């Protein structure tokens, strides 16, 4: 029995099923994927999921457009549902607020191994911090693949939950964002406590790393350790090479690299 026959048979049940039962049954059997609406800093989101976890996140606009795009991208129907599987429901709202999956199951099976590795690395960037594309490339063992990293982040199917908004260009500019225009990237980072204006000012003046003259350690400027350094002890560097030449060693937490 194919999925269309099953849908017809379910619709022909002589006893009226509770509203929402048909979509929930279809999603539960894996015949189609489901989606729900959730709130976020950027407004309402449409969050899709399948049997293995969350598959897509988009800004809530025209649901029919979301459905069409989803089916084109994933080759599977997606329908609105009333109920979310417990394994997802338990952690979904927390993941959206935290900007990282945590214990929320996320299905990256439709991605290439490289794309999935890029997203897993991005998911480790702490809330309110940013890293350059080069950092992600080195984290996954592909230091020469900076441009490919950017492409993988641009096609991130689950933005907000996997925080591609925390990855910036090598010159410190924020760049594009897969979930709407670049201003959404700034809005998310501001909501996480990042002083966006200060970060952009440093970047515009060529500052890529900062160090503490008391510890002799240099960091990415948004690293939580760097932000604890008082202004009187803060040293700015244009490159990793400059920091090392001055006798500074890299932070073991943010692992600064030349982008």
Residue ranges, per PLM feature:
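Basic nucleic-acid-binding alpha-helical/helix-turn surface characteristic of O6-alkylguanine DNA
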Residues: 1-143, 191-259
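Structural signal for hydrophobic
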Residues: 122, 164-165, 188
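Regulatory, non-catalytic segments
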Residues: 145-159
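DNA major-groove recognition helix of helix-turn-helix
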Residues: 153, 178, 258
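Short Lys/Arg-enriched helix C-cap and helix-to-coil transition segments
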Residues: 160-168
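Phospho-regulated, low-complexity intrinsically disordered regions of nuclear gene-regulatory
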Residues: 173-193
